[in-house]
Structures are given as C-alpha cells and as structure tokens.
C-alpha cells in the first residue's frame, strides 16, 4: 500500500515596502488620533507601497525569499497561486505576472480573491495538488497594495490597512508533518459589509464612479467585527477537531492581523498564553491576504517556530469568508 504524500511548507518569505505611515501622520490627514486608532485596533503604523510598485512587485520579492528558503529555483515550481484583492489589473492574473517576473515558466498560475482569508485558502488548494501527487512544488502568495484602493478621506477605513506580501512554497515533507487539515467557509449574504463597489461588470468604471470614490473600500465596521469574533472561534475549534487536536496542543497561533481586540478574544477563548500568539499588526496594519503569510514568515525567521510545533492559522475576510489550518512544522 502506498504511503500518503504529506504536504507542508518548504520555505517562506515576505516583503514590506520601505515607506512607513504612522498614526501621527494620519492625524494630519483626517480627523483622528494616535490614541483613538491604537485603542480600537492596536495599529501604530503601516507600510505604503511606492506609486511605482504594483502588487506583483511585492509578491515577486516575497517569492524570491521563499524560494531561497526552500532551496528551490523558479523552474522547480509547478504552480503559482496569488491571493489578492488588489491585482495589478483585471487580467491577466497577477500570478501570471509573478510567473514571468520569476522566470517560473513551468508553473501554472492563477489568482484567488477571498479577501483576508486568501492565503489560507491558497495553502489548502496547494495541499490538494501536492497530496494527490499531481504537483511537487506550489508557490502560494498573499499580496496587497491596499493603499491604492483606500479613500484617504474616510477615517474609518484609511487607518486600518497597509501594503505587503508574504509567500510560502508548499511541497512534499516527511510523513506525519505538514498541513494536517484545513477548514474553509463563506457566507455570501455578508458581502455587502466589506466590498469595493465599482470597477467590475456590475458597475464599470466611469467619470461618475471615480468622482464618487466608488473604487475604494467600503466597510460596515461593526458588522465585520461581530462576524470576526464569532468566526475566529468557530473556525479554530472546527479545524482542531478535524485534526483530532485541542487548544492545549497549539504551540503558535498565527491569526489574521486585523484588530488586537479580535485576536485577544480568540486567545482567551483558546486559553493560550501571550507568547503563543504572534502579532505584528502594530507595525503593518491589516494587509488582507498578505497578513497571515507575513506573520508566519516573521515568526519562523525569529525562531519562534521549530520542527514539530503545531501551528494554527485563522483568518476572516471579504465575502464574507473564513479559513483556518493546522500545520505541524517540518523545517
């Protein structure tokens, strides 16, 4: 009987733009304060991409670092998945642009649009291709340039988001390690709570849509907050049960970096100590699909994750969507 192929993470990488926008900078732009932002979100600063940088540029840099960490060449890749809500353009996909940038011409390439849940969705997709034996090396990227779709006059949203990219190479690992399970979900009835109205077939771009700022993020903050608190709980418990694990088995929780109050509520329900929860939103804000990918790479490179550790990732996002995964670290 053939032994089941285990799919895990071979390498990680991340990239953050150089420009830092602090809460004090935002005080000069909109009616807000450092105290207000910090108290309600935990965010102190965020990174902003240069006007010349597109999402694919950030994704490419993160990918190079992930490939180096995995000791692989671009031509070793069989597939590239980019999770983003800020693609370079409607088509071709940002993944195809990254493929060309890397010279990974043996790889299939496509984008997924799952909001902040995108990177974990991508890991789950990659896991299936590797475990079935169809592909050996799949590059999963979460990348965003949210600064380009923010209404900088809307103090309720412009303080929340930042730019960045994270990447992971998913491939074969030793039996018993790797991605142990995933849980993905969606509730399309909540799509109205977090969306960008214009630019698609429902509302094509026009002078009117531009003048009305309809190419920017619209969010019902309270509705998203209530959804997030509920789903962070259910998604973590569900994926742990699927893997036959309990909260006591978690060595590191890597949550979507949206709001410290949401993360703290999840930490308390799981009864985890602070050192078992990785948080970097104070530095980067909410980077949507890049959030979990960047945090995972940072935690690994800081030595906070070691071989055999049980890593729980969880996210929620536009759609509305949610995703969680359990990884037994193999590096």
Swiss-Prot record:
Pathway: Lipid metabolism; fatty acid biosynthesis. Keywords: Acyltransferase, Cytoplasm, Fatty acid biosynthesis, Fatty acid metabolism, Lipid biosynthesis, Lipid metabolism, Multifunctional enzyme, Transferase. CDD domains: KAS_III. InterPro entries: ACP_syn_III_C, ACP_syn_III_N, FabH, Thiolase-like. GO terms for molecular function: 3-oxoacyl-[acyl-carrier-protein] synthase activity; beta-ketoacyl-acyl-carrier-protein synthase III activity. It is found in: Cytoplasm. It comes from the Bacteria. GO terms for biological process: fatty acid biosynthetic process. Belongs to the thiolase-like superfamily. FabH family. NCBIfam families: fabH, PRK09352.1. The last Arg residue of the ACP-binding site is essential for the weak association between ACP/AcpP and FabH. Homodimer. This is Beta-ketoacyl-[acyl-carrier-protein] synthase III. The gene is fabH.
């Amino acid at each position: 009987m053939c032994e089941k192929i285990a799919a895990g993470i071979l390498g990680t990488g991340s990239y953050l733009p150089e420009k830092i926008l602090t809460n004090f900078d935002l005080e000069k732009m909109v009616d807000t304060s450092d105290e207000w932002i910090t108290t309600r979100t935990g965010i102190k600063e965020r990174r902003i991409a240069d006007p010349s940088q597109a999402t694919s540029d950030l994704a490419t840099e993160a990918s190079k670092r992930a490939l180096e960490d995995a000791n692989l060449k671009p031509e070793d890749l069989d597939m590239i998945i980019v999770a983003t809500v800020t693609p370079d353009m409607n088509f071709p996909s940002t993944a195809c642009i990254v493929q060309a940038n890397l010279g990974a011409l043996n790889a299939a390439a496509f984008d997924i649009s799952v909001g902040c849940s995108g990177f974990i969705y991508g890991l789950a997709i990659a896991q299936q291709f590797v475990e079935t034996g169809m592909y050996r090396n799949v590059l999963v990227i979460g990348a965003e340039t949210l600064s380009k779709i923010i209404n900088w006059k809307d103090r309720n949203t412009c303080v929340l988001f930042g730019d960045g990219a994270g990447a992971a190479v998913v491939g074969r690992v030793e039996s018993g390690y790797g991605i142990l399970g995933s849980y993905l979900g969606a509730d399309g009835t909540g799509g109205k709570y977090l969306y960008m109205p214009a630019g698609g077939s429902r509302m094509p771009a026009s002078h009117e849509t531009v003048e009305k700022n309809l190419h920017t993020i619209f969010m019902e903050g309270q509705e998203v907050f209530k959804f997030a608190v509920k789903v962070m709980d259910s998604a973590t418990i569900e994926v742990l049960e699927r893997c036959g694990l309990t909260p006591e088995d978690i060595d590191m929780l890597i949550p979507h970096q949206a709001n410290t109050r949401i993360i703290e509520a999840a930490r308390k329900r799981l009864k985890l100590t602070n050192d078992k929860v990785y948080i970097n939103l104070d530095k980067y804000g909410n980077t949507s699909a890049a959030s979990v990918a960047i945090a995972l790479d940072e935690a690994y490179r800081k030595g906070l994750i070691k071989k055999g550790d049980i890593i729980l990732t969880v996210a929620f996002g536009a759609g509305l969507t949610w995703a969680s995964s359990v990884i037994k670290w193999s590096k």
